[in-house]
Amino acid sequence: MSSWLGGLGSGLGQSLGQVGGSLASLTGQISNFTKDMLMEGTEEVEAELPDSRTKEIEAIHAILRSENERLKKLCTDLEEKHEASEIQIKQQSTSYRNQLQQKEVEISHLKARQIALQDQLLKLQSAAQSVPSGAGVPATTASSSFAYGISHHPSAFHDDDMDFGDIISSQQEINRLSNEVSRLESEVGHWRHIAQTSKAQGTDNSDQSEICKLQNIIKELKQNRSQEIDDHQHEMSVLQNAHQQKLTEISRRHREELSDYEERIEELENLLQQGGSGVIETDLSKIYEMQKTIQVLQIEKVESTKKMEQLEDKIKDINKKLSSAENDRDILRREQEQLNVEKRQIMEECENLKLECSKLQPSAVKQSDTMTEKERILAQSASVEEVFRLQQALSDAENEIMRLSSLNQDNSLAEDNLKLKMRIEVLEKEKSLLSQEKEELQMSLLKLNNEYEVIKSTATRDISLDSELHDLRLNLEAKEQELNQSISEKETLIAEIEELDRQNQEATKHMILIKDQLSKQQNEGDSIISKLKQDLNDEKKRVHQLEDDKMDITKELDVQKEKLIQSEVALNDLHLTKQKLEDKVENLVDQLNKSQESNVSIQKENLELKEHIRQNEEELSRIRNELMQSLNQDSNSNFKDTLLKEREAEVRNLKQNLSELEQLNENLKKVAFDVKMENEKLVLACEDVRHQLEECLAGNNQLSLEKNTIVETLKMEKGEIEAELCWAKKRLLEEANKYEKTIEELSNARNLNTSALQLEHEHLIKLNQKKDMEIAELKKNIEQMDTDHKETKDVLSSSLEEQKQLTQLINKKEIFIEKLKERSSKLQEELDKYSQALRKNEILRQTIEEKDRSLGSMKEENNHLQEELERLREEQSRTAPVADPKTLDSVTELASEVSQLNTIKEHLEEEIKHHQKIIEDQNQSKMQLLQSLQEQKKEMDEFRYQHEQMNATHTQLFLEKDEEIKSLQKTIEQIKTQLHEERQDIQTDNSDIFQETKVQSLNIENGSEKHDLSKAETERLVKGIKERELEIKLLNEKNISLTKQIDQLSKDEVGKLTQIIQQKDLEIQALHARISSTSHTQDVVYLQQQLQAYAMEREKVFAVLNEKTRENSHLKTEYHKMMDIVAAKEAALIKLQDENKKLSTRFESSGQDMFRETIQNLSRIIREKDIEIDALSQKCQTLLAVLQTSSTGNEAGGVNSNQFEELLQERDKLKQQVKKMEEWKQQVMTTVQNMQHESAQLQEELHQLQAQVLVDSDNNSKLQVDYTGLIQSYEQNETKLKNFGQELAQVQHSIGQLCNTKDLLLGKLDIISPQLSSASLLTPQSAECLRASKSEVLSESSELLQQELEELRKSLQEKDATIRTLQENNHRLSDSIAATSELERKEHEQTDSEIKQLKEKQDVLQKLLKEKDLLIKAKSDQLLSSNENFTNKVNENELLRQAVTNLKERILILEMDIGKLKGENEKIVETYRGKETEYQALQETNMKFSMMLREKEFECHSMKEKALAFEQLLKEKEQGKTGELNQLLNAVKSMQEKTVVFQQERDQVMLALKQKQMENTALQNEVQRLRDKEFRSNQELERLRNHLLESEDSYTREALAAEDREAKLRKKVTVLEEKLVSSSNAMENASHQASVQVESLQEQLNVVSKQRDETALQLSVSQEQVKQYALSLANLQMVLEHFQQEEKAMYSAELEKQKQLIAEWKKNAENLEGKVISLQECLDEANAALDSASRLTEQLDVKEEQIEELKRQNELRQEMLDDVQKKLMSLANSSEGKVDKVLMRNLFIGHFHTPKNQRHEVLRLMGSILGVRREEMEQLFHDDQGGVTRWMTGWLGGGSKSVPNTPLRPNQQSVVNSSFSELFVKFLETESHPSIPPPKLSVHDMKPLDSPGRRKRDTNAPESFKDTAESRSGRRTDVNPFLAPRSAAVPLINPAGLGPGGPGHLLLKPISDVLPTFTPLPALPDNSAGVVLKDLLKQ
């Protein structure tokens, strides 16, 4: 039934949605149409304002002919289409109407059911009122409110529905008429257009016949319009009256309800306050109240469902109205056909009316004005109605909310309340939306009526148009004013319509949404019901399984504990006899509560034990690792052997214990599969315990855990069973409610279908019996549960004892563990000490190694210095008389340094000796440790052999996991290596740069301070070296510590993670096994949840792993960076040392050349300053000249200015290019950095992806397992399905048989009851004639009908769905009847045939008798023969008698059968009578419809009469306008009278309805009686429940008493057991002593194992440290070897250099002896030069001041020049003889693209374009070859081939690392070789001599480049500001010095050949300062 109702609800929801959608679309169309009408009205009026209408009418005549023909064609086409559509529609509409009638019958049934439900609601409310005290008030209020709502609403809704039906019918009519209007308007527009076009033509001569025809058509159309308008006006007046009445009722009701609700709100608030204050006082009473409120809320839920049903009923009513509307439409169609006939007749008259058509137009204008006014009024009224409706909806919603809030005391019921509120709100919204739509439709109707009135008025005035024309012309002016007003009103109306449209659309959208939500909710409800059913089935299955399991458990427990059970069984038997039926349920409840409490405690204990086990396992794993490590390093073999023996003994004992425990486990394994899984884990644990004591501990814990789990499972099962019982009870109650509902429905439908009701009743009885059976079974289950519970109690008691023992054992073990921990802590402390000593050793060793290194280096330095000293001494001895004082100073300084170094060396040697002693001691201790480790290794190898056999199972699992981890690690390492390589590359680059920069900075510093090296400098260097050494040491230590930390972290983390993964894998395997074995859906779900949780955990673990790996990699990279930095610093140190040596050597030689260089440099600087001054002065002159020329001659200046502009532009372009290049460079840098970042990110992503891949693989494996499980379940389902299919086939077969029997029976019945059939035939005949009458009525436009048909189809489909379910039920019943009748008929036929056979036999026998009589007469003489014959005859007679008796018996049987058949026939007659009642109901409905039709016809007649009255009124108006008002008043009065009549008729209809309702109430009373019966049965149920509760209470009391007795008996038993114990004490004492010994041995073993573990730990730690030290040592050795090789190479190179230098010096010494005298002279000269230099510097200062002044002048001139340039620019634009810039640019670019041989031709071309003569060009080329100035090429940065004339330095590149002193020497040299000074650029353009940019850039230039530079630039290019390399991004045009405040424009400077540039070459790293110095020396 629930599914049927659900289907009905969903169908209704869909139909509602469709109806809403169609209504929305219709209203939208109407609103759009009204807008269009208004717009067109204005256009018409505006078009028809001019007075020249007569001319238009004349022009129209000609056009109307052609137009008339077109209209005729259109009419014919439309008629054909119309006929075709009518033929189609007739068939469809008949079928739909039949179906609608069926639906209406169903609706009546549903209404009856609704009334019954309402009665039930009232009852429930009365029950709710009996709630005591606090809850009483809200309950009563709620009930009262509900009753109120029920009393008021249905009637109102009914009225609404009636009106709604009328609206729908009128809406359809409106749509049709609106289409007609639009068509007519389009025609009017067409005519107007034609009239406008043909105004100019003016066709006066038109045929009179055409005009007449058109006039006829117009008249006919106007008549139609007037009729329709009258009809609609009447309908509208009726509707308005009804609406006004409704509005008043609604407003009154709304006010009343509001006041009620306000009062209720106040009451509820007071109650809430009271409830809040007295919470603490009345807890018990409140609980009771809460229960009551729960019941009330459930009742309210039922009520809400009823409300839903009511709404569904209303929807059905609306469907009814639709059908009535269709009838109206059919009538209208018929009318239309008649009108069409009339139209054809009137077509002839149309010609006469053509002239009058134009005269009617002003009247149309008037009517449009009146129409707009009416529309405005109606819109206002509609808006008022809308407001009222909305208020009502709101009030209803508020009422619902208030009612729910009154029952909101219990927080747990808040959710139900919310749901109810939501549903009610949704329903209210739907209601309000429907009302809005209705009102909108009414508005549209009114508007259309007005329009039709306009058309009607025009039609009626056709007769008196001539007379009105004159009056209308007079009134035109007045009307024009009114027109303006109407236009403004119309605009407002349009706005209102738009707003209404928008509101309507929103409402429709909302309605659709609500319907979707309702349908979704229904679907969800259905799904929930199905799920609950499935759950019930599953729970039942589980109960059976649990019962089986419990039986097994009880059997096993009986076997174990027979003695206790026997003693308890005797007691139980005594008590069970008294307490079987009464105490079971209560006892179960109490025990279950206890079990739940114990469950909770056991769960807690389990959790604690699990944690304990986990800790133990972690300890075990740690100890195992330590053992494995310590196996390689154990000592004390003798002591260990003894320990081993003890341990083996211990292990044997433990094995015995374990065997006993395993037996227990095997018994427990039978209990459940879950327990088996845990036992398997235990077995594994036990195996571990055989080898290690800690594992034994874990095993014991697991045993206790398993026992707890068994207990927990039993308790859980009990809890579940109890829950299932409760649930079953609830389900029974729910089902009882459902059945009650079904009974009510059946009772409603009884009058219609008595046979169906009887069958339903039987079905219900069967169901009740089934339920009783189920209840009995459940009672049995409860009994079984009782017994089970008692047994489980025994089990629990035994398990508790075992637990106690286990806890004692655990305590002992914990004591042992504590002792072991203490020992381990001591060992740990010792280990820490050793590790500290080792660290100290390591540090000392490192220091010693470093000292050794430093010593070696110092020795080598010493040797070198000694050699140098010897050499210097020799030189001094040779050149004693001419020795320098500086050389002597340096010698003394070196000697003092040597002495200091010797002292340092001695100190270092002493330290080394001390450290060596320490290292030897440590080595000895290490050797001892190693020996002990080796001994331990031997012992541990033996142990390992034993372990390997035992751990075979474990190792396999671990190996698999290890392989996975290894693969991961490999991938991680690969990635790390890649990362490391990339980072190393980056770091090496960075280090190179770092080194270079450092070296450069150091070189600069050294260069600057070379000329006064002293003691302080050497000391500073030594200190720096020491500091660097210290830094290196610190960094090394840091690196070592970091590497250690990293290794430790990685090892620990990997270990932990692997352990966690192993645990998780084990758990997953267990779960998989469980999934594969168990078929319980709940278990599967639980396991799936666990799986998900584990997957989450695993993901987290992987995430942690990834993070740790990242950290590792990060730390490693940092370590590598640190190493690189250290290496860089060391390299820098070595370079510094080398440079110091070189400087010391060089300083001695270069001392004498210094003076010369300084003098030369100073003189050169002075010359350069002079040159600059000259250049500036020339520039000033040129500027002045330019200014003069610009001011005087414009013509001459044109070309110059052009050139000037072009050059400036080119400069700007080049600047832009340079900027672009710089930007590009920056972009490239940024992209490189981005690429680096991206690479890092990608690597991280790679790691993440790998981790994800692993996770995915795991998930895949899990999914595969799940998939296999699902496949199995799927196969099972398939088998079930097949079985079901077979059953279905059987059922179908039986149904088919039944159908056959039914057919036969029906045939019989036709013969038996022809009267019935004739009666039944009458109804279909009447229906057919009705259909025929209706089919005649069908005549409307095909498009609208098709749309409506589609809607009807949809509604029919939905209704079909509901009817099908009912039909199926009917079919079943009819099938069963048919089957029985068939069987009876067959039997009857058989009996008939048998009777016939018997009759035939009788005839034969009679004939035989006659023959025998004749024989007797003939042979009477022969006595003998006659006697013999007689005897035979007697025998034959006896046989015949037997046959006759048989026949009689058969006849009796047949009579019985006939009686049965008669009874069945009577039943069938009864069913037919029921059907007759149904047919009568149908006939009544038909009668109603016919009544409706008659009413409609009457209305039509009234409308026609009205029309006539109006026509008379109009005629009277034409005669005289004075009597119009009176006539109108009379008409109004007549209308009112008619409305009164109609209302009376309506009241009569209502009375008839009330009679029907009375009949319904009679039916309801019957239903009420049935309900009373049900109520009594419910009371009986309640009584039985109370009785049960009482019996349970008594049972609990007796159970308690029984427990007390049990306790007493147990005490007696304990006394007996104590006696037994005393007898067995001797045995126990002996065993106790043995156990004590065993425990002592165990303690010893534990102590020994702890010691061993601790030593193993220490060993492992030390091993790790040793490994780390070895690694670091290896690294350091590698580094050392590398350094040594480098140093050797350096030393060899140095030696060779020194040898060469010595040879050179020897030669030089000989030369120098000769030159000493000349040098003294040179010295004198140098002194003189220095004096001159000082003078030159003074001069330089003066010159610089002059230069500054000139610069200022220059700037001023520059400003003037800029102004002049601007003027020139303006002149250049106007001046002639311009050079084509594009051509010049192309030539210029071409010049550089052409090969060097052909460049002269390009230049000649340029010259010819610029107007340079050939002679001048040749001269220029000649000058260019000869080295004359060529500023353009230099300026553009082209490679200059010519040598510039500026004095240059000997080597450009050597300046880089040179100090000021060096530069000074070079300057002196250059001064000694003077050259002609060329004109110079500005001082700002000069780069300073020692600018760092230049230095840096030139350091790395290769020698080859230097040579080329020298060859090109001669001596000195440094001064040139244009020689800045391109790599520095210096613009070629704007030199470094040129700023915004720089000197004048480049073009104004003298054209000089000082602008050569060099393409930058890549710097080579091997270019050191030494090479530069060598070059210097060579030059």
From Swiss-Prot:
Q: How does it sit in the membrane?
A: Peripheral membrane protein
User: What InterPro entries has UniProt attached to this entry?
Assistant: GRIP_dom
Sites annotated Breakpoint for translocation to form TRIP11-PDGFRB:
1754-1755
What is this protein's tissue specificity according to the annotation? Highly expressed in pancreas, muscle, heart, testis, peripheral blood leukocytes, and in several leukemia cell lines. Detected at intermediate levels in placenta and kidney, and at low levels in brain and lung. Isoform 1 and isoform 2 are expressed in articular chondrocytes.
Region of interest (Involved in RAB2A binding), ranges:
1017-1195, 1325-1599
- Segments forming a coiled coil: 52-1773
Against PROSITE patterns, the record matches this protein to: GRIP (PS50913)
Q: Which residues carry this modification: Phosphothreonine?
A: 1846
Subcellular location per UniProt equals: Golgi apparatus, cis-Golgi network membrane; Cytoplasm, Cytoskeleton; Endoplasmic reticulum-Golgi intermediate compartment membrane
Domain description from the entry? Answer: Extended rod-like protein with coiled-coil domains.
Outline what the protein does: Is a membrane tether required for vesicle tethering to Golgi. Has an essential role in the maintenance of Golgi structure and function. It is required for efficient anterograde and retrograde trafficking in the early secretory pathway, functioning at both the ER-to-Golgi intermediate compartment (ERGIC) and Golgi complex. Binds the ligand binding domain of the thyroid receptor (THRB) in the presence of triiodothyronine and enhances THRB-modulated transcription.
Q: What name does the UniProt record give this protein? A: Thyroid receptor-interacting protein 11
What gene is this protein translated from?
TRIP11
